A protein has these predicted regions:
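Ribonuclease/tRNase effector modules and their secretory precursors
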Residues: 1-107
């Protein structure tokens, strides 16, 4: 049984901060927000570790969108909020467009 504090994985991002992904948060993402992401933990881990691009949210300067190409005109996006030096995975989804925002990093 997964406890609320069980860590699925933790990654270091190219921006120099870590993102621990907790089992309970991942469950919320795949149950309520984006069920299509079920079973794609490794893909999101890769997106956080090796994104093609990272953009900063226009609405919240502490939110970063990590993008990795999945196929032409299709990206995986991991949305991370950085608080007190560490990242928190807000959500993850597949998209056909990269959001407008300040580019922070490109591979």
């Amino acid at each position: 049984m997964m406890g609320a504090e069980e860590r699925l994985f933790e990654v270091s991002t190219p921006l120099g901060f870590t993102v621990p992904v907790m089992a309970e948060q991942w469950k919320k993402i795949v149950t309520f927000k984006h069920p299509i992401m079920s079973g794609r933990q490794r893909d999101i881990q890769e997106t956080l570790e090796n994104p093609g691009e990272i953009r900063r949210s226009r609405k919240d300067p502490n939110v970063y969108l990590f993008y990795r190409v999945e196929r032409p005109n299709r990206w995986l996006c991991a949305v991370v909020k950085r608080l007190e030096g560490e990242g928190f995975l807000v959500t993850a989804y597949v998209t056909d467009a990269i959001k407008i925002g300040e580019s922070e990093w490109r591979s």
